[in-house]
Amino acid sequence: MWTVHIPRRVARQLPKLPQRVQRSLFALLREIEEAGPVRGNWPNYGKLSSTRHHCHLKKGHPTYVAVWEITPAGVRFVEVIYVGTHEKAPY
C-alpha cells in the first residue's frame, strides 16, 4: 500500500477542474495507493525521470494531465505535484 499526498496548492485547484477530470484523478490516486506509482495502463503514461511520472486524465482540447513524484529510499510515498492542463505542466 502506498501513501498519496496532495499538497495544498494542488488541492486548491481541484474544484476548478471539470467533474470528469476530478473523477479520473481520484481513480488514478486509488490505483496508485493500491498498485504503486507506475501506471502503464493509463493513457499517455510516461516516466519523466527516475522519480517523476505523468499521465493524461482527459484527452482532447484542452488535455488534462497529472504529474506525481515518488520519494527515494524505499519509502512508499507519492506526492501529486501538478493536476491541470497540458500546457502548464511542469515537465
What do these predicted regions represent?
Residues 1-3, 12-16, 20-23, 27, ...:
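Enriched for short, Lys/Arg-rich terminal
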